[in-house]
């Protein structure tokens, strides 16, 4: 059970925004979805990519001192042979994604007696060690996320994380007052403000419905609906992280699809599409605009990673189980960004 405190010395007092926030923020949305299988994925929103690829990491690829771990697949920027994951899922079905949390994320120095993990290795260490959400909770019970950089000139990204499998979903936020682990009953995460505030804000929208509204304004007035969709009037439509959280939660909660793989994957991308960004709508600097660089969907039960990019709206898939998961070398698939158009004549 998640307890939300909304007064006194609480999460509101911990929420801050850096002076250069407009320059530092980039926006993302992560969701879960379940039909016959469990699905997990996200939009990554930014103004430019960093050469990210879909990466399969086999069990015997060396992560520092760890020579053996669960195999995993995800989106990463591979630097000096090391996959810096944006999001990933392991062979057991546990998934994780890092989302921007500027102004609130805080990583300190190593603490004796704690499980010290650098921010850049958080996803890899977690998914390499934990088979499910219960093991992830135990893994996080004594964790200290440090500001140790991957290399000189590459500072730690300010993130928080959504972690999930078919049995549950949690959010991890490392702030100045410690590491917080929250249950996530809606299976959605965006960026700022901190997760408890995002979740509490759903109370303002409890009257929204996919059904047509009834006239409760006045029995003396002959008020009638004049359009479909009026039950959701008031649902935020802007691109701010708070509004995307509310919109994604509403769409996910009311989303219906068939149980087949194609129907499930298609619906998953439609849910993410409700909060995707189009070039020109979110200016971050003169002439520079944030867009949804890619959207991804993991079938966590089958080990398949699906994605589409801003320029390529077709769905591309990588199946981790078609690779040698007992190998020692990562397998990298650069994202296909070229627009693909199917002509019927």
Model-based region annotation:
Residues 4-26:
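Short, Lys/Arg-enriched N-terminal segments with co-localized hydrophobic residues
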Residues 23-33, 39, 148-151, 156-157, ...:
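C-terminus-biased signal that marks the final domain/tail of proteins
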Residues 25-115, 142, 147, 332-336, ...:
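A contiguous strand-loop segment
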Residues 41, 98, 173, 306-308:
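Beta-strand residues in well-ordered beta-sheet regions across diverse protein folds
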Residues 46-48, 102-104, 177-180, 187, ...:
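Short, surface-exposed beta-strand-loop junctions and turns on beta-sheet-rich folds
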Residues 113-149, 261-270:
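Proteins synthesized as precursors that undergo proteolytic processing into mature forms
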Residues 134-174:
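Active-site periphery "cap/insert" segments of enzyme catalytic domains
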């Amino acid at each position: 059970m998640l307890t939300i405190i909304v007064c006194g010395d609480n999460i509101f007092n911990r929420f801050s925004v850096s002076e250069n926030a407009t320059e530092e923020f980039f926006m993302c949305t992560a969701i879960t979805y379940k039909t016959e299988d469990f699905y997990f994925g996200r939009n990554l929103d930014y103004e430019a990519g960093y050469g990210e690829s879909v990466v399969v990491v086999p069990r015997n690829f060396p992560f520092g001192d760890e020579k053996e771990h669960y195999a995993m697949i995800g989106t990463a920027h591979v630097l000096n042979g090391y996959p810096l994951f944006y999001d990933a899922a392991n062979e057991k079905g546990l998934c994780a994604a890092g989302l921007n949390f500027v102004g609130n994320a805080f990583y300190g120095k190593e603490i004796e007696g704690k499980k010290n993990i650098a921010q850049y290795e958080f996803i890899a260490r977690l998914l390499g060690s934990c088979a499910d959400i219960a093991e992830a909770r135990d893994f996080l019970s004594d964790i200290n996320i440090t500001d140790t950089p991957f290399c000189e000139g590459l500072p730690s990204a300010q993130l928080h994380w959504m972690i999930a499998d078919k049995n549950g979903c949690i959010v991890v936020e490392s702030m100045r007052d410690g590491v917080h682990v929250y249950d996530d009953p809606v299976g959605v995460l965006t960026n700022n403000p901190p997760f408890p505030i995002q979740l509490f804000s759903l109370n303002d929208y409890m009257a929204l419905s996919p059904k047509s509204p009834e006239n409760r304004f006045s029995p003396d007035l002959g008020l009638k609906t004049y359009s479909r969709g009026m039950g959701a009037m008031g649902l935020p439509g802007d691109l701010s992280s708070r509004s995307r959280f509310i919109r994604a939660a509403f769409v996910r909660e009311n989303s219906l699809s068939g149980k087949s793989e194609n129907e499930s994957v298609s619906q998953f991308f439609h849910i993410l599409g409700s909060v995707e960004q189009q070039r020109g709508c979110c200016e971050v600097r003169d002439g520079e605009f944030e867009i949804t660089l890619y959207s991804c969907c993991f079938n966590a039960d089958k080990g398949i990673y699906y994605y589409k990019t801003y320029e390529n709206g077709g769905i591309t898939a990588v199946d981790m189980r078609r690779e040698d998961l007992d190998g020692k070398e990562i397998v990298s698939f650069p994202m296909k960004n070229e627009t693909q158009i199917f002509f019927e004549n």
